[in-house]
């Protein structure tokens, strides 16, 4: 019996471009959705832009446009990118929509009526210049525990301490630089602890990924907390009913955006919205997300739905991050590749196939090895799959006017290919795409071996063997048809071209029905080889793109410095003696490697050469150096006799010196030419 299903992807934030990391999730979901359609299931695939929040409000102001203009431009770009990669959404909407406002307001009122919304007065830091309350991440200052400078308002990335923004020493607004004041404000909280029993039961259902189940157990053990769902004006979002100058936090209305996008589709097509969202719905609901937002989708979202007496997700499918050549995507190396840049140079089906060949059901990072990318695409798609069709089609066209044989040359081999149908289907269903691809390519090898063993090019030279030639080549084309049917969810454009050649639609139901006695069209090139020069073009364009952005930012930074030359500087510290200074062992060090700490918003990890040994130093200057790889080879000054500090993200064996007020306004100290690693600063 046909299943009714609704599938979503995480909503891309409307404050930046789509990159190949985003595309992993959307390709994964699209393959699964296309497979379900081939199996005859009634499935709807929706998404939207996540269009609210302080970052969007501030970015729009920085650009001199309205938030509405910013998110409209982002949506246009995002839709074009997804279309370019053949992501087959039934609807792509925005959280800044009337449907989302109505559903968000309705759900909030329902939660409030059911007693799940609490309110209390909290103290917050307030920017007197911008006249706005400051979220934790928009406050910086000195850690009250370890005295590390330029730390965020909620936790220290040097000593891993957590604290209130009010505890920061010398706090400042990350928006204006002003010293914030403390103001009280009433906030609204979602009572998540009330749903602990339901969430534990949901966790024990056995359908969630084991990694999610284990993580949820950790959160249960540490204790669930009430969730602040409100933000004070000014804020770009939806106003909270009956609460002046209060707005819903972006993470409240973002997942509701799934419902809003589907509601928009229902209103246009006549679908029954309630059938998919009512508490006792027999339909299936699946969310594809990245591992970084499991917390919201496995705790807050199902609890909110349950509190509104709506259905919970059937499952949440999380995936890992994308790395390129074994390391985090890098702007300076040209591997932080935007979808639009990729599409200018490379067929999107290449990436769809490569991701599919590596994706499984676990939450694992996926490495895009550029050399392997080229090799695998050419080996599998061009040399094996497409070549299987081309080497047989030429004989059918020239010798038999495109007509295939009336019977199968090798019924046992055909039966072997058909027998794998349900196993391949099971791999697709379980999101084990790598296993499906491996099995399909094994069959492809068998098909090519069949043609090699039969050698139609030899048969073609033998008199009186036309029937045998037609039978062998028809068999080769028949096996190609079966393989393309299996690969249609992964390679929809190639499948469409194959359908034009075969003059039949590729469906799961007709896989076992051979094209006996039918005609095929004249063969045209189905797929082009992937060349290294195409990869190089993408890398170089990416480097140029971000180099231009950095140049523009540097220009703005210089103008800012020029405009603030006469502003006050920090006062000179208390006087010390020469003996105090002598306690510091300052050394010259050469940067061997430098990379961002993925889990940290502040830290860079340095490997430093001090002449006779090397050291690792973690430094909180990430905001000032967007391209840490460019620091390799540079000489810096460090405090060499500072006791090693065990931090959340590793051990730091010293301190690198820099000057500035903090954040992006930090500058590493360097030395003149001729300096050598290990030299002492005197």
Curated annotation (Swiss-Prot):
<dbReference type="Pfam" id="PF01588">
    <property type="entry name" value="tRNA_bind"/>
</dbReference>
<keyword id="KW-0479">Metal-binding</keyword>
<dbReference type="InterPro" id="IPR015413">
    <property type="entry name" value="Methionyl/Leucyl_tRNA_Synth"/>
</dbReference>
<feature type="domain" description="tRNA-binding">
    <location>
        <begin position="580"/>
        <end position="682"/>
    </location>
</feature>
<feature type="short sequence motif" description="'KMSKS' region">
    <location>
        <begin position="328"/>
        <end position="332"/>
    </location>
</feature>
<dbReference type="InterPro" id="IPR014758">
    <property type="entry name" value="Met-tRNA_synth"/>
</dbReference>
<dbReference type="InterPro" id="IPR033911">
    <property type="entry name" value="MetRS_core"/>
</dbReference>
<dbReference type="InterPro" id="IPR009080">
    <property type="entry name" value="tRNAsynth_Ia_anticodon-bd"/>
</dbReference>
<feature type="binding site">
    <location>
        <position position="159"/>
    </location>
    <ligand>
        <name>Zn(2+)</name>
    </ligand>
</feature>
<dbReference type="Pfam" id="PF09334">
    <property type="entry name" value="tRNA-synt_1g"/>
</dbReference>
<keyword id="KW-0436">Ligase</keyword>
<keyword id="KW-0694">RNA-binding</keyword>
<dbReference type="GO" id="GO:0000049">
    <property type="term" value="F:tRNA binding"/>
</dbReference>
<dbReference type="InterPro" id="IPR014729">
    <property type="entry name" value="Rossmann-like_a/b/a_fold"/>
</dbReference>
<feature type="binding site">
    <location>
        <position position="156"/>
    </location>
    <ligand>
        <name>Zn(2+)</name>
    </ligand>
</feature>
<dbReference type="InterPro" id="IPR002547">
    <property type="entry name" value="tRNA-bd_dom"/>
</dbReference>
<protein>
    <recommendedName>
        <fullName>Methionine--tRNA ligase</fullName>
        <ecNumber>6.1.1.10</ecNumber>
    </recommendedName>
</protein>
<keyword id="KW-0963">Cytoplasm</keyword>
<dbReference type="InterPro" id="IPR012340">
    <property type="entry name" value="NA-bd_OB-fold"/>
</dbReference>
<dbReference type="GO" id="GO:0006431">
    <property type="term" value="P:methionyl-tRNA aminoacylation"/>
</dbReference>
<dbReference type="InterPro" id="IPR041872">
    <property type="entry name" value="Anticodon_Met"/>
</dbReference>
<keyword id="KW-0030">Aminoacyl-tRNA synthetase</keyword>
<feature type="short sequence motif" description="'HIGH' region">
    <location>
        <begin position="12"/>
        <end position="22"/>
    </location>
</feature>
<feature type="binding site">
    <location>
        <position position="143"/>
    </location>
    <ligand>
        <name>Zn(2+)</name>
    </ligand>
</feature>
<comment type="function">
    <text>Is required not only for elongation of protein synthesis but also for the initiation of all mRNA translation through initiator tRNA(fMet) aminoacylation.</text>
</comment>
<dbReference type="InterPro" id="IPR029038">
    <property type="entry name" value="MetRS_Zn"/>
</dbReference>
<dbReference type="GO" id="GO:0004825">
    <property type="term" value="F:methionine-tRNA ligase activity"/>
</dbReference>
<keyword id="KW-0862">Zinc</keyword>
<comment type="subunit">
    <text>Homodimer.</text>
</comment>
<dbReference type="InterPro" id="IPR023458">
    <property type="entry name" value="Met-tRNA_ligase_1"/>
</dbReference>
<keyword id="KW-0067">ATP-binding</keyword>
<dbReference type="GO" id="GO:0046872">
    <property type="term" value="F:metal ion binding"/>
</dbReference>
<dbReference type="Pfam" id="PF19303">
    <property type="entry name" value="Anticodon_3"/>
</dbReference>
<keyword id="KW-0820">tRNA-binding</keyword>
<keyword id="KW-0648">Protein biosynthesis</keyword>
<dbReference type="GO" id="GO:0005524">
    <property type="term" value="F:ATP binding"/>
</dbReference>
<keyword id="KW-0547">Nucleotide-binding</keyword>
<comment type="similarity">
    <text>Belongs to the class-I aminoacyl-tRNA synthetase family. MetG type 1 subfamily.</text>
</comment>
<feature type="binding site">
    <location>
        <position position="331"/>
    </location>
    <ligand>
        <name>ATP</name>
    </ligand>
</feature>
<feature type="binding site">
    <location>
        <position position="146"/>
    </location>
    <ligand>
        <name>Zn(2+)</name>
    </ligand>
</feature>
<dbReference type="InterPro" id="IPR004495">
    <property type="entry name" value="Met-tRNA-synth_bsu_C"/>
</dbReference>
<dbReference type="InterPro" id="IPR001412">
    <property type="entry name" value="aa-tRNA-synth_I_CS"/>
</dbReference>
